[in-house]
Each structure stands twice: as C-alpha cells, then as structure tokens.
C-alpha cells in the first residue's frame, strides 16, 4: 500500500477539515433545543439520536487525512464516555474550539510547544476552580434533577432517582427493553460480581455479546476445572432437566472449556463458565455468600467434596443470570431466607468489629451484594427507532447521575465553564504560553455559545451576560429565562464537565504539536476482473 506524507500546515489543515466535519455533526445536538442526527444502519432501521459518542463512532470520511482528524476528536468523545458516561458532545465542542483557535495562532508563527504549556497551565487552574464550586449531591430531588437534565426528560430523572434510592448509590441498575409502550421501574433481589464469561462462544445474544440464562442451576467451586471428565457426571444430570447451568470456578480451561463450548454450539446444553470473584480467603467467603444466596453448596476440598460426586441437590438455583464479558449478575437467588438473614447479620457484626478500613470496605461490598437488589429500568416506546433513542438517553442519564453522586454537581448549561473564566484569565503567562491560556479561555465559552445558537440566539451576547452575572446565574435555553442554574435544577455532574475539559485539552495539544501525518492512499487501479473460473478474463 502506497503511503503519502504531509507536513506542517498542510497536515494540520487537512486534519482540521475532518475535525470540523465530525464536530459540526455532533454539536447540533447540544442543549435542550439541540437537534437530532439520523444514522444510516445497514439491514435495520436508521437510528435517530442526539448522543455525541454514538454519532462520532459512525463517522468515516473518504479522505484519509480528514478521517484521521475526525478519529482524533472521536477519541475525545470515547474517552469522556468511558470515564464519565456522558458529556461527549461538550467534549467534542471544546476540542474543536481549542483546535481551531490554536491552529490560527500556530499558522501565525506561534510555537506549538509553548501553546501546549499554556493549555496545560490553564486547564489545571480550571479543574481546581471546578472542584471549588462543585456542590455535593445528596437528596433524592437533586439526583432526579441530574438525570432529568441529561436525558431532557423529567420522568427518566425520577426513575433513576427511585432506582438509586431502592438499591443504593452503588447498587446495580440495568436498562432493558420493555414489551409495552410504557417505561417502568422494577427492583429485583440480586448479586453482581466483576467476572465475565470464559469464552465469547458462550453468549446467547451475539449482537450484544451477552449471555442470559433463565432458571439456571449454579455450580459453585473453588477448584480449577481443566478436565471435562470432572464435570461430565453433573452435566449429564443437567441435560436430563433441560435447564442451563452457570459454572463458577477458580478457572475453567483446557479440555473442560473446549468441550463446554463445543456442546454449547451443538445445542447439547447451555452452559456459561465464569471465574470466581475475589482472591484467597476473600474468594472463599464470596463463594459461600453466593452459595447461601442461591441455596447451593461450595464444592471444595475443605468439605471433602469432589466435582465428580456432585449432584443436582448440591447446585444453587436462580431465576435469571446475566453475564457480559466483564460482569455476572445473579437475580432471584433461591436460597433459604433465614440463612441469608443470618449471613447478613454475620457480615454486619464483622463490619462493626474490624479495625481495617480496607477490610470494612470489602465487607460492606459483600453485604450490599447479598442484601441489595438489582433495579431494572424497562424502556418502552411506540417504535423500535424511538426505543433505541430513548434507551441511549437513559444510559447517558444513569451514567451522569452516578458521576454526580461521585464528584458533585456544578451549574449546567455551560454556565460553570464561563463562571471560572476570570480565574483562568488571571493565570500569569507570557509569549506563546499566554497564547495557550487564551485558547482555553476561548474554548470555555464554546459550549454555552453552541447551546444558544442551537436555540436560535446569538451566542456572544449570552456569553457576555453570564460573565457579568452573579455566580451561578445562567441562561435556561429551554424556557428562554435567566435563572440561578442550581436552584432551577439545571446542573451538570462535575466529573462530566472535568473529563470533557481534560480530554479535549489533551487531544487539542497533541493536534497542535503534530508536524507530519502519514496516510495510506487508496489504490487507483483496483485488481481487474479475472472472469469466471475456468474461463479467460472478460473484457
């Protein structure tokens, strides 16, 4: 494959075109009056969304240099989504603003390295100020406000707030598709641990790469399973019942894993194997928790039990098991209620007695998994297209709410970034470093400017008014009013705003210090048609 190299201004200009194409498609969705973007999907209905990272992932440009620029900004959205779960559009708008303003200065002769130092300096001060003005989230109403703003839907905010109230801020909340038109909240008892399936061939839904087991048996052991012969007797008993099985073991590999996968693919039985959670003594304790929750026994040498002698009566039972590549959730464990209560009491006593903060934290985690529940938000809609769009919004809102509980909230609608403008402007710097600071200052205005423009207003006027308004006062684009943003419930999680600014600055600094770009060029003469087999090439 032939490769082409572009240098300096040519390289940056070519990539900027891609940055602008992606960012312009994403930023129209920002704010309460933002628009939707329609994404073409092969073989299925188009997806209508206002989720920044979903749009960014779909964009592929023909020109290789433009595509590289677009992918750089898509990385900002991806990274922000990974860290905070929301704020991807804001991050994209910030990155575009920094790159555009920075490129103007680099073209005029400024040193990119000096500019980078200025950007880093200004962002460090901005992050300190965001932390200083951040407000802790505690009440149910505040949690609902965060969810409502993220999803642009008060009902969704209420669902998330209720779910977190019922299972705790750190509880497990999942989002599923409803069979009806209404969105509903359902809370079910359950336990989750951070271990996924041993092989992707165990999934029951290859599109989502998940394994859902209905009414499964659960084999719990602290042994390593390498030989298929060790578990063959119990699997033969399982086949007679036509029920699936979840195998929780120290590890499942070798001959055992191969045969489980082969039999799964042949349809002989449905089995999913996962590694046991935790390590050492803590693993044994967590397996005992799981056994009590599901009414099973831990197959362990400590009790003189062998895998070959395992019977169906020793297995745990659950209503449903949900397994992803990273997590396993066991819902409706069918253990004896009195045994579960006794175990909960035992854990509470251990928490009171322990002096180690680390041990206390781990015991509280186990208690939450044993006594806590799983909240399920069942999303309903009239059409499949609306369902997908609504589901994406609820996922963003849930992530946003968790982020708010973790690091607090700041005034929303881009107000927080403008309110720290003067503090960042006070950063002492000279020359190209000062230019880098000014680039960040310009970017701080970009989100509120875009929100205003999406609402049909002049962004510059709104920005200047906020700069001279009282702290916390901002523009509510939904109602066209000037209000105290936090009092009005228009808030953003500090973590989301922080992550968006950090990631945008990181990519912008890398972009501006790029001096050469190497791209693969498409072949001008594709391979000619070789004709049909056994016949000469056709003209």
From Swiss-Prot:
The organism sits in which domain of life? Bacteria
Asked if Aminoacyl-tRNA synthetase is a keyword of the record, the answer is: no
| Compartments where found | Cytoplasm
- Tell me what reaction this enzyme catalyses: ATP + H2O + a folded polypeptide = ADP + phosphate + an unfolded polypeptide
Q: What is the enzyme's class at the highest EC level?
A: isomerase
- Which CDD domains does the record match to this protein? GroEL
Gene3D superfamilies per the record?
Answer: GroEL, GroEL-like equatorial domain, TCP-1-like chaperonin intermediate domain
Q: Name one Pfam family in it.
A: Cpn60_TCP1
Q: Does the keyword Isomerase apply?
A: yes
State the family named in the UniProt similarity comment for this chain: Belongs to the chaperonin (HSP60) family.
Q: What does this protein do?
A: Together with its co-chaperonin GroES, plays an essential role in assisting protein folding. The GroEL-GroES system forms a nano-cage that allows encapsulation of the non-native substrate proteins and provides a physical environment optimized to promote and accelerate protein folding.
Which PANTHER family does its entry note?
A: 60 KDA HEAT SHOCK PROTEIN, MITOCHONDRIAL
Q: What is this protein called?
A: Chaperonin GroEL
Which source organism? Macrococcus caseolyticus (strain JCSC5402) (Macrococcoides caseolyticum)
What high-level taxonomic lineage is stated for the organism? Bacteria, Bacillati, Bacillota, Bacilli, Bacillales
Gene that codes for this?
groEL
């Amino acid at each position: 494959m032939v490769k082409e190299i572009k240098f300096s201004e040519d390289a940056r200009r070519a990539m900027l075109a891609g940055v602008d194409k992606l960012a312009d498609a994403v930023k129209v969705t920002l704010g309460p009056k933002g628009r939707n973007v329609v994404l073409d999907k092969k073989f299925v209905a188009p997806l209508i969304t206002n989720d920044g990272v979903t749009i960014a992932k779909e964009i592929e440009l023909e020109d290789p240099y433009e595509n590289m620029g677009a992918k750089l900004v898509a990385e900002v959205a991806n990274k922000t989504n990974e860290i905070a779960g929301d704020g991807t559009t804001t991050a994209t708008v910030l990155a575009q603003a920094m790159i555009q303003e920075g490129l103007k200065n680099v073209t005029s002769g400024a040193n990119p390295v000096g500019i980078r130092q200025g950007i880093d300096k200004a962002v460090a001060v901005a992050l300190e100020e965001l932390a200083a003005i951040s407000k802790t989230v505690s009440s149910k109403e505040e949690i609902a406000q965060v969810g409502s703003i993220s999803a642009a839907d008060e009902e969704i905010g209420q669902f998330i707030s209720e779910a977190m109230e019922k299972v705790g801020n750190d509880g497990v909340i999942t989002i599923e598709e409803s069979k009806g038109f209404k969105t509903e909240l359902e809370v079910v008892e359950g336990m989750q641990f951070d271990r996924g399936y041993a092989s992707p061939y165990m999934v029951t839904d290859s599109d989502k790469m998940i394994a859902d087991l209905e009414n499964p048996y659960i084999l719990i052991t602290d042994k390593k399973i390498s030989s298929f012969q060790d578990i063959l007797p119990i699997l033969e008993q399982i086949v007679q019942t036509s029920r699936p099985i979840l195998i929780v073991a120290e590890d499942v590999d070798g001959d055992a894993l191969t045969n489980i996968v082969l039999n799964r693919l042949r349809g002989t039985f449905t089995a999913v194997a996962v590694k046991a959670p935790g390590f050492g003594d803590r693993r044994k304790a967590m397996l005992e928790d799981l056994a009590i929750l599901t009414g099973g026994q831990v197959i362990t040498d400590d009790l003189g039990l062998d895998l070959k002698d395992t019977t169906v009566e020793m297995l745990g039972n659950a209503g449903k098991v949900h397994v992803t590549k990273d997590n396993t959730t066991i819902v409706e464990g069918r253990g004896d209620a009195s045994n579960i209560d006794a175990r909960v009491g035992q854990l509470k006593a251990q928490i009171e007695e322990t002096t180690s903060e680390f041990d206390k934290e781990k015991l509280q985690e186990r208690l939450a998994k044993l006594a806590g529940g799983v909240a399920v938000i069942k999303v309903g809609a009239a059409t499949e297209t609306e369902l997908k769009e609504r589901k994406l919004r609820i996922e963003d809102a849930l992530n946003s709410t968790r982020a708010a509980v973790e690091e607090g909230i700041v005034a929303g609608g881009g107000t927080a970034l403008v309110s720290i403008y003067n503090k960042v402007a006070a950063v002492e710097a000279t020359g190209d470093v000062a230019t880098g600071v000014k680039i960040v200052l310009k970017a701080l205005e970009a989100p509120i400017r875009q929100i205003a423009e999406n609402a049909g207003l002049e962004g510059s006027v709104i920005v200047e008014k906020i700069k001279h308004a009282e702290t916390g006062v901002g523009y509510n684009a939904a109602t066209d009013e000037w209000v105290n943003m936090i009092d009005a419930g228009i808030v953003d999680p500090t973590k989301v705003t922080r992550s968006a600014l950090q990631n945008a600055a990181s990519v912008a600094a890398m972009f501006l210090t790029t001096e050469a770009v190497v791209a693969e060029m498409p072949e001008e003469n594709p391979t000619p048609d070789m004709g049909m087999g056994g016949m000469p090439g056709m003209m």
